[in-house]
């Protein structure tokens, strides 16, 4: 699910110290450092890419790449369910990795600080796994059994969908992340995904839907907890 290089210019303008209003506890929080789970996810993805790159020295195939990638045809013949998870942390080259991690640093920091590390991590993993499962169904339905898919963008779209839901349900929740900005970011990504070949648009769309649904569930639960004084 490779991301176009245009993301670098778009999101580089967004990576800066931000402030947003936390309506759940009435505090203002400054994003002046990267939250721990977001940072760990970025480090893990970079570490895996380094190992893959070392394994490909001399034109060889990386054993780790073969172990983690989600190859549709092979998965259908012999379902190795862990690949629905491992492929979320695997990328096809440094450009693919850099584009995804740049977005994750920004959106992940917002989501993790707003919702807490465990809710954030849960939505990230559920969105990524769900996006991969949907991708298997989609490519089998299309007859594209030779497709191999990997990347964090399904999970990242889940975080974008989560934030979109929260912004819609609590107007003005984020001072620096507006509804218009989120919609533009997602539309921009999808547009270039459909305009270019080799992009897993199914993962993007399904990831966003899963994240949005998770956002509804989390928002309602947090409102309930606040009403009950918990």
Question: What annotation goes with each model-predicted range?
Answer:
Residues 2-3, 9-230:
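A detector for small-residue-rich transmembrane helices and their helix-helix packing motifs
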């Amino acid at each position: 699910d490779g991301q176009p290089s245009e993301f670098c210019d778009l999101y580089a303008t967004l990576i800066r110290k931000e402030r947003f209003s936390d309506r759940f506890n009435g505090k203002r929080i400054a994003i002046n450092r990267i939250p721990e789970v977001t940072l760990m996810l970025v480090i893990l993805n970079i570490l895996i890419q380094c190992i893959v790159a070392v394994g490909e020295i001399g034109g060889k195939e990386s054993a780790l790449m073969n172990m983690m990638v989600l190859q549709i045809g092979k998965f259908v013949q012999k379902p190795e369910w862990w690949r629905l998870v491992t492929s979320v942390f695997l990328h096809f080259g440094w450009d693919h990795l850099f584009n995804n991690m740049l977005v994750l640093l920004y959106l992940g920091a917002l989501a993790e600080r707003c919702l807490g590390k465990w809710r954030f991590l849960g939505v990230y993993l559920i969105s990524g796994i769900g996006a991969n499962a949907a991708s298997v169904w989609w490519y089998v339905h299309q007859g594209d059994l030779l497709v191999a898919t990997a990347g964090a963008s399904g999970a990242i779209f889940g975080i974008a969908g989560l934030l979109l839901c929260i912004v819609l349900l609590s107007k003005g929740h984020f001072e620096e992340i507006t509804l218009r900005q989120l919609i533009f970011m997602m539309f921009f990504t999808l547009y270039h995904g459909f305009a270019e070949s080799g992009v897993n648009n199914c993962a993007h769309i399904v990831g966003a839907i899963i994240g949005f649904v998770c956002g509804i569930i989390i928002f309602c639960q947090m409102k309930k907890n606040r009403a009950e004084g918990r």
